[in-house]
A protein has these predicted regions:
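Short, solvent-exposed loop/turn elements at domain surfaces
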Residues: 11-13, 35-38, 170-171, 221-223, ...
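Generic recognition of long tandem-repeat/solenoid scaffolds
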Residues: 27, 161-162, 222
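Conserved functional hotspot residues or short segments at active or partner-binding sites
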Residues: 174-175, 179-359
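Cleft-lining beta-strand/loop regions that shape enzyme active-site pockets
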Residues: 1-157
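Polar, glycine-rich mid-to-C-terminal structural blocks
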Residues: 121, 133-134, 140, 144-211
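Residue-level structural signal for beta-strand termini and adjacent loop
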Residues: 4-5, 90, 165, 180, ...
């Protein structure tokens, strides 16, 4: 008999932390969980030992989580006494959250990346840093979720979530988008952004001019529908060709990369001792392309005309093979190499004149 004991599988909230270039660190947070703050401190200290002087904090696609964790993270970047967020409702007295003196990165250059998938706790962090003139916000308008809800459990196991208050940024703006129309209209709002061109053009961003606020540094910010970035970066629909997208989402590229890495593991690990060596030197050659073509034929991927010259193919294969050898330490740096928002963040951090915060 074989006894199998289930092990604990940790779910991390920091996807990756690495140096984009000398002096500039990058940390991507996917959710605000109970362990996020401790994970951040570890990642921050690791990057500091590698010489990090400036930071890119990636909150894109981060749907939120615990308020406490968002406050702890924002506190790392704000000086003692500065307001982070406050909550208030008709029957919910105003409660203000302020920064303490424990922040470890209060004076260095900081960029925060957001997009339409950044919500709730992500918006609390981005809003606090924007309103205090502490960070340059880059990307696209965030989701717009700023409600405080209390959960009431019912006898049948279901629950009711009752809205009791709203979150407000330090300047007093609500980040909650309107929900005075139908429920369908509320949930379709993100699709409307796509239809109206907001994901591709900064001029198409809908802002309520009646809800203008001024930061201490004199910057105009808007309430009533998410965080509007200081620097807009459009959605990139051309990063990968349609063929590459089809092969990727079908799982064929993942399975090929897994088999390739497994078959050549000893050779590859002998040649590339570390993730940085793999990132800088591993390339996709003609033999590998022919192997993939044969693999696709064996999997009967009918209708897919693959040449190996498709946009993004080499990049995504390198990233997938790298993930099988070095996990996220190779996967994300390769995948992010031509990420428009990250490239813009690096450009801003290199050029002090582009930083939108008041020193």
């Amino acid at each position: 008999d074989i006894t199998i004991t289930r092990g604990k599988i940790p779910i991390y909230s920091i996807d990756v932390a690495y140096m984009v270039e000398p002096g500039i660190g990058f940390i991507k947070i996917s959710r605000f969980a109970g362990t996020t703050y401790d994970e951040y401190l570890k990642a921050f200290n690791d990057l500091s030992r590698q010489g990090m002087k400036k930071l890119i904090l990636d909150l894109r696609g981060n749907g939120g989580g615990f308020l406490r964790t968002a406050v702890e993270l924002a506190d790392e970047f704000l000086a003692d006494g500065l307001q982070i967020v406050y909550t208030e409702g008709k029957a919910h007295p105003k409660k203000v959250y302020k920064a303490s003196s424990k922040g470890g990165f209060e004076n260095s250059d900081l960029v925060v990346l957001i997009d339409e998938g950044s919500a709730s706790a992500s918006e609390i962090v981005a809003g606090a840093l924007q309103d205090n003139d502490r960070a340059t916000i880059i990307g696209r308008r965030s989701f717009g979720k700023g409600l405080v809800q209390d959960q009431i459990d019912l006898p049948d196991g279901s629950a009711v979530r009752l809205t009791i208050a709203r979150y407000y940024t330090p300047t007093g703006r609500s980040i909650q988008k309107p929900y005075d129309k139908s429920l369908d209209a509320y949930y379709n709002e993100e699709y409307e952004r796509f239809e109206h061109g907001e994901l591709y053009n900064a001029d198409s961003i809908k802002v309520d001019k009646s809800k203008q606020y001024k930061t201490p540094g004199g910057k105009t910010v808007y309430g009533g529908g998410g965080i509007v970035p200081d620097v807009f970066v459009s959605l990139d629909t051309m990063k990968f060709s349609p063929v590459v997208n089809k092969l990727y989402y079908s799982g064929l590229l993942n399975s090929f990369a897994f088999e390739y890495a497994d078959q050549h593991r000893a050779e590859l690990m002998n040649k590339y001792k570390t993730a940085p060596q793999f990132i800088s030197a591993f390339g996709v050659d003609a033999r590998m392309i022919e192997s993939l073509k044969a693999y696709l034929v064996s999997k009967k991927s009918n209708g897919v005309e693959f040449s190996g010259r498709e946009t993004g193919f080499a990049q995504i294969i390198r990233a997938l093979v790298g993930r099988n050898l070095f996990d996220k330490d190779a996967y994300y740096p390769i995948l992010n190499a031509n990420d428009a928002a990250i490239l813009k963040a690096v450009e801003v951090l290199r050029d002090a004149s582009q930083i939108t915060v008041k020193k």
